[in-house]
Amino acid sequence: MELTTRTIAARKHIALVSHDHCKKSLLAWVMENRDLLAQHELYATGTTGNLVQKATGIDVHCLLSGPMGGDQEVGALISEKKIDILIFFWDPLNAVPHDPDVKALLRLATVWNIPVATNRSTADFLIGSTLFSSEVTIAIPDYDRYMQQRLDLK
């Protein structure tokens, strides 16, 4: 697939997602990084978002709960280029009924080349990067060209 570029603004749109067994860890991480995260636009699946808002007072765009379609909502926002970073503390040791949604979410984050943190260490590396609060240009699929080629029936 051909690539193009996308510029991500210094003020990021960050999605926060966590499995039930990881919510305490994500909340602790958010609390430790509250001041920096408050400078960005936060989105989250339902339960996670409400817990973050309650614990920090930061406004969060709360989507549906993950198992009720929230993971897919986040994936759609990624595809629409409305999410710049995904912080997803997931539990690799416990299966969840919506595992296919989880795989799809991680796949879309990879397709659209956005940074993903899946645990505290990667989240620390990501938020500690000078790029976290800087404008940055990333390579993404050239969807317009992709559609043009698919519609060219010659």
Curated annotation (Swiss-Prot):
Q: Known catalysed reaction(s)?
A: dihydroxyacetone phosphate = methylglyoxal + phosphate
E.C. number(s) listed in UniProt? 4.2.3.3
Q: Which PROSITE patterns match?
A: METHYLGLYOXAL_SYNTH, MGS
Taxonomy, superkingdom: Bacteria
Catalytic machinery residues: 71
Protein biosynthesis as a keyword of this entry, yes or no, is no
Q: Does the keyword Lyase apply?
A: yes
Q: What cellular-component terms does GO give this entry? A: cytosol
**What keyword terms does UniProt attach to this protein?**
Lyase
Q: Which residues bind substrate?
A: 19, 23, 45-48, 65-66, 98
Q: Which residues form the MGS-like domain?
A: 1-154
Q: Which GO terms describe its biological process?
A: methylglyoxal biosynthetic process
- Catalytic EC class: lyase
GO MF annotations, alphabetized = methylglyoxal synthase activity
Q: Which InterPro entries match?
A: Methylgl_synth, Methylglyoxal_synth_AS, MGS-like_dom, MGS-like_dom_sf
PANTHER family reported in the protein's UniProt record = METHYLGLYOXAL SYNTHASE
Q: What family is this?
A: Belongs to the methylglyoxal synthase family.
Per the entry, what this protein does is: Catalyzes the formation of methylglyoxal from dihydroxyacetone phosphate.
Q: What is this protein called?
A: Methylglyoxal synthase
Q: What is the lineage of its organism?
A: Bacteria, Pseudomonadati, Pseudomonadota, Gammaproteobacteria, Enterobacterales
